Curated annotation (Swiss-Prot):
InterPro entries, per database record: GPCR_Rhodpsn (IPR000276), GPCR_Rhodpsn_7TM (IPR017452), LPA_rcpt (IPR004065), LPA_rcpt_EDG2 (IPR002277)
Species in which this protein is naturally found: Xenopus laevis
GO biological process, one term: regulation of metabolic process
Name recorded for this polypeptide: Lysophosphatidic acid receptor 1-B
Role of this protein: Receptor for lysophosphatidic acid (LPA). Plays a role in the reorganization of the actin cytoskeleton, cell migration, differentiation and proliferation, and thereby contributes to the responses to tissue damage and infectious agents. Activates downstream signaling cascades via the G(i)/G(o), G(12)/G(13), and G(q) families of heteromeric G proteins. Signaling inhibits adenylyl cyclase activity and decreases cellular cAMP levels. Signaling triggers an increase of cytoplasmic Ca(2+) levels.
């Protein structure tokens, strides 16, 4: 005969098993609307004025990103004066930003009301493309900062890094970017853990967003430290040079030119990335904050960084600017065909600015 305690404990055990099963349940077959509704993120049913504005502006920026970065890659390929490690990294940066343009272009046609048509797999693919492209861009910026740091402190115009090492660096950059973009698709998501879903990215886990945000912030801090170290080093050199030479104006111009470049690089990164990174942290740490109202605009702001990189790193170079004009005008001159006398003087303006102060200081002291 079944006792009363056994009779009561049996349904309790069944309830606990049901609860455990529900906690481990996965929702791969659910619609995107299911995740959006659960996270509280509004999913548009029709195109409104804001959605049309964001889409139109986004497509325009995407086209500019792809054309501008394609121009950079072609310029570096056709001009032999750019066949140095720093320019190969700049070409890879342009490739990463070109890929970012493609990723955003795909996003623009799969956002707004079109999001409802996506499956779980295609939604993760859409976000993964963006994560991969942005990670590649940031990693390239870091690689360029490291290369500049090594070049300045070794007092060289170009690093002696072999082409094989440059290829290894590029492969590492893209490997890291692809892994970072693929992590949510291979399991680090909230499809089986709905309680920890993000509000901004309803299929992403809060823990992954924190990890991705910290990864980018640490990269940003490393870049700041590297450029700050370069600036302090060059400033000390130029101050010594001003005491041992008769060209203080040149010294001051050298230091100010470097400062301007550093401010542009870091300023663009801060303006374009910081709001989005802060928004991701607020999404996890401040659930009551109304962050979704600013999401699309901060996404566009981050997208602008890929459009600004060709201008910052390439267009300030006079040789690069001249090559742009020759390509756009379908001209072919000896400057593009191969190196000529004075080609070293046409190198990167940042290289020339830094090394002008460093080498002049060495000669004046000696």
């Amino acid at each position: 005969m079944t006792s009363l305690s056994e009779f009561v404990s049996e349904p309790i055990g069944m309830m606990s098993q049901t609860s455990a099963a529900s906690e481990s349940q996965c929702y791969y077959n659910e619609t995107i609307a299911f995740f959006y509704n659960r996270s509280g993120k509004y999913l548009d049913t029709e195109w409104n004025a804001v959605s049309k504005l964001v889409m139109g502006l986004g497509i325009t920026v995407c086209i500019f990103i792809m054309l501008a970065n394609l121009l950079v890659m072609v310029a570096i390929y056709v001009n032999r004066r750019f066949h140095f490690p720093i320019y190969y990294l700049m070409a890879n940066l342009a490739a990463a930003d070109f890929f970012a343009g493609l990723a955003y272009f795909y996003l623009m046609f799969n956002t707004g009301p079109n999001t409802r048509r996506l499956t779980v797999s295609t939604w993760l693919l859409r976000q993964g493309l963006i994560d991969t492209s942005l990670t590649a861009s940031v990693a390239n910026l870091l690689a360029i900062a490291i290369e500049r740091h090594i070049t300045v402190f070794r007092m060289q115009l170009h690093t002696r890094m072999s082409n094989r090492r440059v290829v290894v660096v590029i492969v590492v950059i893209w490997t890291v970017a692809i892994v970072m973009g693929a992590i949510p698709s291979v399991g680090w998501n909230c499809i089986c853990d709905l309680e920890h879903c993000s509000n901004m990215a309803p299929l992403y886990s809060d823990s992954y967003l924190i990890f991705w945000t910290i990864f980018n912030l640490v990269t940003f801090v490393v870049m700041v430290v590297l450029y700050a170290h370069i600036f302090v080093y060059v400033r000390q050199r130029t101050m010594r040079m001003s005491r041992h030479s008769s060209g203080p104006r040149r010294n001051r111009d050298t230091m100010m030119s470097l400062l301007k470049t550093v401010v542009i690089v870091l300023g663009a990164f801060i303006v374009c990335w910081t709001p989005g990174l802060v928004l991701l942290l607020l999404d996890v740490c401040c659930p009551q904050c109304n962050i979704l109202a600013y999401e699309k605009f901060f996404l566009l702001l981050a997208e602008f960084n890929s459009a600004m990189n060709p201008i910052i790193y390439s267009y300030r170079d006079k040789e690069m600017s001249a090559t742009f004009k020759q390509i756009l005008c379908c001209q072919r001159t000896e400057n593009v065909n191969g190196p000529t006398e004075g080609s070293d003087r046409s190198a990167s303006s940042l290289n020339h600015t830094i090394l002008a102060g460093v080498h002049s200081n060495d000669h004046s002291v000696v």
